[in-house]
Amino acid sequence: MATLLHIDSSVFPSAASASRAVAETFRTAWQEQHPDGTVIYRDLSANPVPHITADAHTAGFADPATHTPGQAAAFAEREKLIAELEQADAVLIGAPMYNYAIPSTLKAWLDNVILMGRTAANENSKVTGTPVTVIASRGGSYAPGTPREPYEYVQNYLKAVLSDALGLELEFIVPELTMAAHNPAMSELVPLAEASRAKAHEDAAAKAKELADRFAA
């Protein structure tokens, strides 16, 4: 049975979070195709993973037999997160834009799972080629040609780490202009925001079914 690793990082509940809501659409469509499959779920806002410490970092480059008690404890946490990623047939990540970047909790998760010689810089990595769908929501628009394009650090960063470093098969779904309904200065953009959100839900369902069919074959 196929395994989906689902990561949420928004600080808001689904009713107030585009990334969570669209990710739910993806997950629901996936589970309809794989009712007996496994979903590994991590809510990084409710249960943050540890930030990388010196012990966690150095343990990744040392023989486990030589680990200090501090290194062993810190690396055990990394090992758990890496094992979940290696187990996944597909990955789903909710990545809202906060102050032009990803939430710090998501950065902490990435710092834990990127391990040189295992998940990165390893031609035999178990995660290479794993499809990852990122719901990259944002309050405005940072699309090519817009005034804020130079401030788009979410997709650019995640491409570097997920695709270039980890070798995952990356696709973005981008619900944008999510603040239009709450900011009077953006009121004229509400129709565009609604269209963007509707398309994001449609794309999420379609992508989930596409991947589910791939692993059912």
UniProtKB/Swiss-Prot annotation:
Enzyme Commission (EC) number? 1.6.5.-, 1.7.1.17
Positions that bind FMN: S10, S17, A18, S19, S137, R138, G139, G140
> What Gene Ontology terms describe what this protein does at the molecular function level?
electron transfer activity; FMN binding; oxidoreductase activity, acting on NAD(P)H as acceptor; oxidoreductase activity, acting on NAD(P)H, quinone or similar compound as acceptor
Q: How is the cofactor bound?
A: Binds 1 FMN per subunit.
Q: Give the first-level EC class, as a single word.
A: oxidoreductase
Matches recorded under Pfam families: Flavodoxin_2
Q: Which UniProt keywords apply?
A: Flavoprotein, FMN, NAD, Oxidoreductase
Quote the catalytic activity from the record.
Answer: 2 a quinone + NADH + H(+) = 2 a 1,4-benzosemiquinone + NAD(+); N,N-dimethyl-1,4-phenylenediamine + anthranilate + 2 NAD(+) = 2-(4-dimethylaminophenyl)diazenylbenzoate + 2 NADH + 2 H(+)
Top-level taxonomic group: Bacteria
Write down the required cofactor(s). Answer: FMN
Q: Which family is this protein grouped under?
A: Belongs to the azoreductase type 1 family.
The record's function comment reads: Quinone reductase that provides resistance to thiol-specific stress caused by electrophilic quinones. Also exhibits azoreductase activity. Catalyzes the reductive cleavage of the azo bond in aromatic azo compounds to the corresponding amines.
Q: How does it assemble?
A: Homodimer.
The protein depicted here goes by the name FMN-dependent NADH:quinone oxidoreductase
Query: What organism does the record attribute this protein to?
Result: Streptomyces avermitilis (strain ATCC 31267 / DSM 46492 / JCM 5070 / NBRC 14893 / NCIMB 12804 / NRRL 8165 / MA-4680)
